[in-house]
Amino acid sequence: MADNMTTTQIEVGPGATNATINFEAGILECYERLSWQRALDYPGQDRLNRLKRKLESRIKTHNKSEPESKRMSLEERKAIGVKMMKVLLFMNPSAGIEGFEPYCMKNPSNSNCPNCNWADYPPTPGKCLDDIEEEPENVDDPTEIVLRDMNNKDARQKIKEEVNTQKEGKFRLTIKRDIRNVLSLRVLVNGTFLKHPNGYKTLSTLHRLNAYDQSGRLVAKLVATDDLTVEDEEDGHRILNSLFERFNEGHSKPIRAAETAVGVLSQFGQEHRLSPEEGDN
């Protein structure tokens, strides 16, 4: 089964998160304008309402992780999102967008833009995936939790109990787990804790996630070059479970970095947000 696996590498930064939220806000603005023209059918109206609720929730959660000077309302993000659409549609890489900084690389074969092939600039200048060390950085007194032959419910509880006894700051978590008695995965995670007034500690920021198969081969690497801040726990109900399943089945669909991060976080004191049917495997 492991022979069917491929290495998935993902790079994520705060700029990409803001760009995505702003772009979706621009889409919402377009939906609303279409609705004003009475051009949306019932499924379209339903999608508009669901998108608005989702964005309001995501913006509220995301703003908590931003300095007060950088927090924006939905209306402010709509305006930026519309600007983004104009830049994207007219393929103007020199325009620049808040939270979305394009750059050019010479590529004469690109028919859409003869002089350049543009993309969003890596959040940490000069550092791309190939430049980042494969293993998560070493941390002092890392905690190691071993999970074997354990269902999801018990595994989550053990992780919660073990992790919440650790100190603040960065940590490394190793999860060794058998999957359907076929594949044992080793997952290394770096992150940062926040200590709340009541003494409860929660994982607030995910820095790195590596996953290895039983032969020690890296099968997935989640990298946050600037730190990946969790956006919305509701996105992560079943992501960690599906992450294991994808490794086991050699799934070809790329693993979304943000969803994976939120999924990992949902295992740390966020059990109440997990869907009841996830239960035991």
From Swiss-Prot:
Matches recorded under Pfam families: Flu_B_NS1
Molecular function GO terms recorded: protein serine/threonine kinase inhibitor activity; RNA binding
Organism of provenance: Influenza B virus (strain B/Hong Kong/8/1973)
HAMAP family given in the database record: INFV_NS1
GO cellular component terms listed in the entry, alphabetical order: host cell cytoplasm; host cell nucleus
Location(s) in or outside the cell: Host cytoplasm; Host nucleus
InterPro entries, sorted: NS1, uS15_NS1_RNA-bd_sf
Coiled-coil boundaries: none
Location of region: G1P2-binding: 1-103
Recorded superkingdom: Viruses
Family stated for the protein in its record: Belongs to the influenza B viruses NS1 family.
Function noted in UniProt: Binds and inhibits the conjugation of the ubiquitin-like G1P2/ISG15 protein to its target proteins. Since G1P2/ISG15 is an early antiviral protein, NS1 may inhibit the host antiviral response. Prevents EIF2AK2/PKR activation, either by binding double strand RNA or by interacting directly with EIF2AK2/PKR. Also binds poly(A) and U6 snRNA.
Self-association and partners: Homodimer. Interacts with and inhibits human G1P2 conjugation by UBE1L.
Name of the gene: NS
Gene3D superfamilies hit by this protein: S15/NS1, RNA-binding
GO process annotations (BP): symbiont-mediated suppression of host ISG15-protein conjugation; symbiont-mediated suppression of host PKR/eIFalpha signaling; symbiont-mediated suppression of host type I interferon-mediated signaling pathway
Keywords per UniProt: Host cytoplasm, Host nucleus, Host-virus interaction, Inhibition of host innate immune response by virus, Inhibition of host interferon signaling pathway by virus, Inhibition of host ISG15 by virus, Inhibition of host PKR by virus, Interferon antiviral system evasion, RNA-binding, Viral immunoevasion
Region annotation (RNA-binding and homodimerization) ranges: 1-93
Designated name of the protein: Non-structural protein 1
